[in-house]
């Protein structure tokens, strides 16, 4: 007798679409889609290679991804601009990018259990990749981050795109949903108080940029690199070239 194959952890499929909608609305902090919005949400939760593609499903899903990507950037740009007047343009750019990065959004999808809600077809290798990443996110930090599958970030972006359309492009609703969905938010305060946890949210993506910002916010730090102490200021590492910024991933940082 052939042994039944069980879905990999984190890759189970939720066939009940009403249950899938309820799960998404919970992840969105109780946001409720309008009657027509249910169709938008189903497009967001249908993989671009699903057989429904012949009805234009692929194009609709990808258009929602595109819109959601831009909408998330707008949401976080306005949130940081409004909530922290002390942030300059560089700070705003780095914080926005960190909160909408592929790695950050992939972790959001895992924590909100969004992948099992995705309608997909013949995606066993992808399921395995998602399962492996899910275990790395939910387990203890190993020090060797696994890159988040792009499909996870795509789901988050498509859902946000659906919300933005369903809300009639309401920026206030968009900001609220983005903050609730993407917790924990990477902020200046959080980076200064718990930099390790916040940087782990990103894997390797944008990590160097944020390390530089942390040091700039602290004004001056001592950096030990091969026994040579150098000052770090808002202009970068010592008097060296911008290429030296890459060293920040492998040096030990000690606050002055």
UniProtKB/Swiss-Prot annotation:
One of its GO terms (molecular function) is RNA binding. Mg(2+) binds at residues 65, 154, 157. InterPro entries: RNase_III_dom, RNase_III_sf. Its cofactor is Mg(2+); Mn(2+). One of its GO terms (cellular component) is cytoplasm. Keywords: Endonuclease, Hydrolase, Magnesium, Manganese, Metal-binding, Nuclease, RNA-binding. GO terms for biological process: siRNA processing. CDD domains: RIBOc. It comes from the Eukaryota. PANTHER family: DICER-RELATED, RIBONUCLEASE 3-LIKE PROTEIN 2-RELATED. This is Ribonuclease 3-like protein 1. The lineage of its organism: Eukaryota, Viridiplantae, Streptophyta, Embryophyta, Tracheophyta. Cleaves double-stranded RNA (dsRNA). It is an enzyme of class 3 (hydrolase). Residues 22-168 form the RNase III domain.
